[in-house]
Amino acid sequence: MSESTTTIETAWLAIGQIVAPQGLRGEMRVNPSSDFPERFLIPGPRWLRRPRQTEPEVVELERGRAIAGKNLYIVQLAGITSREQAEALRGCELLVPASDRPELDEGEFHVLDLIDLSVIDQASSTPLGIVRDVVSAGNDLLVVELTDGREVYIPFVEAIVPVVDLAQGRIEITPPPGLLEL
């Protein structure tokens, strides 16, 4: 998995959302939508998109750290020094330029590339649905909207998802009995 899609064209990748202030000195909790922790740990420029805004503004990440046992990061942005200032940023998205996408190893994919791929039953070539999201868990789960409108979670493991063909816009699956009935 990797960064999630964002509603701002394809020039930006959403890497997380500010969910709450942390403490009294302007730190914030961020719910990541990126599998690349350096996005929250290494100081440097990031971009902030406020709700109902289309253009992001540049911000400087001063420092960040992971919260042990939780899928959250604590970040400090330059100029944010109080809990009230941090609270005002609740709901904002942190972004990076799409050109900052890290190179991936064979068999790894960016979430943005998986969204909207067709899902096909490999044995019968029957169209089953469309990938709508990817959820991080022990193994990543593909959130698939089936052709009948139901939503199912498909483990994103090679035994069940042997083919990901980005060029053809499709994923082939070999679902075990009962997986699509859950």
Curated annotation (Swiss-Prot):
Disulfide bonds: none annotated. One of its GO terms (biological process) is ribosomal small subunit biogenesis. It comes from the Bacteria. GO terms for cellular component: cytoplasm; ribosome. GO terms for molecular function: ribosome binding. Pfam families: PRC_RimM, RimM. Signal peptide: none annotated. It is found in: Cytoplasm. Keywords: Chaperone, Cytoplasm, Ribosome biogenesis, rRNA processing. Residues 106-179 form the PRC barrel domain. Its main location: cytoplasm. Binds ribosomal protein uS19. Belongs to the RimM family. PANTHER family: RIBOSOME MATURATION FACTOR RIMM. The PRC barrel domain binds ribosomal protein uS19. An accessory protein needed during the final step in the assembly of 30S ribosomal subunit, possibly for assembly of the head region. Essential for efficient processing of 16S rRNA. May be needed both before and after RbfA during the maturation of 16S rRNA. It has affinity for free ribosomal 30S subunits but not for 70S ribosomes. This is Ribosome maturation factor RimM. It comes from Synechococcus elongatus (strain ATCC 33912 / PCC 7942 / FACHB-805).
